[in-house]
Amino acid sequence: SIEIRKDLTDQWKLHNVEEGVQYASLTDIIYQAWAGRTTKEYKQYKGLKKENLRDNMTNEELILNMLAELSTTSITKAKNPQTLDENKQCAKEGGNVARVAREELESKTGRQVVSPLSAKRFFEAQQPKKSLEDNNNDKEEEK
């Protein structure tokens, strides 16, 4: 994921994209295209404040995000954009590649890929729920 992102930002540098606001703008376009949400909306959906969004994606979300960024990199190399608007178009097209994959997976599984679960909430959901009896047994063992 880190290497794919670095390849993408290297391409943006080569194609006249300025770090900071322009990178964030293109990243939002990619997220909006494949996940249907901007970075800010995605973080809000997951209940994140300062946490890193990528660190709180499911494996499916991470893979689709990587596909979106890899596709954007490939399209950028092929089209050689020179303006921010041309780079925005490449970002949208790259994100759309992952959107098609997401929609196909959702149609095959019958469930949404973009999840409100953060890493913390995901791991909490994976833990077996303790029954009232288990809690009572724990208290007995503590005595």
Regions found by a protein language model. Give the residues of each.
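Positively charged, phosphate-engaging catalytic surfaces used for nucleic-acid and nucleotide handling
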Residues: S1-K143
